[in-house]
Amino acid sequence: MRTLILTAASALLMAACATTPKAANPQDIFLARLNALCGQRFEGRVVTTDAADADFASSRLVMHVRDCAPDEVGIPFAVGEDRSRRWVVTRTDAGLRLKHDHRDPAGEIHGYHMYGGDTAGPGTAERQEFPVDSESIAQFVAGGAEVSTTNVWAVEVHPGRMFAYELRRPSGRFLRVEFDLTRPVAE
């Protein structure tokens, strides 16, 4: 009987000392889902109707998940023959960061470059939002693009279904491009 009591007491003590498993960080899951797409290209389409996006809507849109590392994923985004755009999602000490890397065909920086923002909260495993950061605001103001100083970008990854890129402004500006993850493309 004494052995049974000691065994039960020991089991209770060990259970009390056990830690509850830590819930997975949605940003870690999100970045892992991006990395799972590495090496693949997907065709997309504009699903919003803003007249400012007519060129995008009438062009072939292809993203290529490339340049993959545990803490950073680079995603070139081609609009027709224009291959100047690349999205870069990076893990930071405080969360995730989205930057827009714009270069000309020779690889030289052109126009606005490395603008974007950092997540303000944990987001979800499917969606992360990136309000414009102060560095980007300064770049937009210096370049006369004050309208962009309120940008909020979002990226979504729905495994086996869809990837989405969004740009929103409080003024009502809204661009959303959705990519079909069920059909990788060769080029």
Q: Where are these predicted regions, by residue range?
A:
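Short, hydrophobic/aromatic-rich segments at coil-to-beta transitions
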Residues: 38-43, 68-76, 96-97, 160-164
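Short, solvent-exposed loop/hinge segments that bridge or flank secondary-structure elements
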Residues: 43-70
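An exposed acidic His-Trp-rich patch
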Residues: 87-139
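Tryptophan-anchored aromatic micro-motifs
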Residues: 26-52, 100
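Edge beta-strand at a domain terminus
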Residues: 113-118, 160-187
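Short beta-strand segments that buttress and anchor functional surface loops
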Residues: 73-80, 100-101, 142, 165-168
